[in-house]
Amino acid sequence: MANYIVGDIQGCFDELQQLLKQAEFNSQLDTLWFAGDLVARGPKSLETLRFVYQLGDAARVVLGNHDLHLLSVALGHHSAKRRDQTQAVLDAPDAAPLLDWLRQQPLLAEHQEFVLCHAGISPQWDLATARQAAQEVESVLRSPEWSTLIEQMYSDQPDAWHPTLQGIDRLRYIVNAFTRMRFCFPDGRLDMQCKLPPKEVTDGSLLPWFQLPQRIALEKTVIFGHWAALEGYVSETVIGLDTGCVWGGTLTMLRWEDKHYFSQAALPA
């Protein structure tokens, strides 16, 4: 019984299948954790959703920003992004159950030794606060009010956490921290613009969220995806698994028990 954690798939279904063959994944015995962004720019978002859906309890999924955007497109709130290849999902005869299942996935998933989220955990949160914050958004996404949240979540503000935040401002910060965050300012505020590799940010005004000196220490390893420019980042406290398969890089999967990494290069289109 092993736990496998895989980075952003973004519709790169064939690469995922190759990884699972490498690892000899057994859905009857093992658990497969997904770091979000099941869908978007790759060619097989529909096949990916169907596969993860049918895994049932063998799959643990957290929502990514592209997953949330697909829900927004399905609701008619926004248009698909230029490079997205998600129309097949919207046109599928099983679109309704797939999207209903997707919106009920969490922002944060926990193992005894690690936590999984798409972008990271706000440096201003301890683990108890992160759990509570995730549950607040998850409860709305699973309620009749979910469409309103999806419509109103698109903003870079507020960029700082405070326990007194209320309403859509509070929910928007939580969504941004879990699904969009990369860099923070030294005072802990989120920066939603810069997508560069950290080594290319030289003026000291921005730091990766996991390198802020005042970041609250967590008692579990944080595993995340989202940030392909990190090219897979590993430290004592965080593990980044997005290695840019959809951009021609690789799809990366970690077997937690022995910390073995599996890698599959992007296949020709």
Swiss-Prot record:
One GO term of the biological process aspect: RNA decapping
Alphabetical UniProt keywords: Hydrolase
CDD domains in the cross-refs: MPP_ApaH
Catalytic activity: P(1),P(4)-bis(5'-adenosyl) tetraphosphate + H2O = 2 ADP + 2 H(+)
Source taxon at top rank: Bacteria
Listed SUPFAM superfamilies: Metallo-dependent phosphatases
GO molecular function: bis(5'-nucleosyl)-tetraphosphatase (symmetrical) activity; phosphatase activity
UniProt xrefs under Pfam families: Metallophos
Family label: Belongs to the Ap4A hydrolase family.
HAMAP family according to UniProt: ApaH
Job of this protein: Hydrolyzes diadenosine 5',5'''-P1,P4-tetraphosphate to yield ADP.
PANTHER family xrefs: CYTOCHROME C5 (PTHR40942:SF4), PTHR40942
Protein known as: Bis(5'-nucleosyl)-tetraphosphatase, symmetrical
Organism: Vibrio cholerae serotype O1 (strain ATCC 39315 / El Tor Inaba N16961)
Lineage: Bacteria, Pseudomonadati, Pseudomonadota, Gammaproteobacteria, Vibrionales
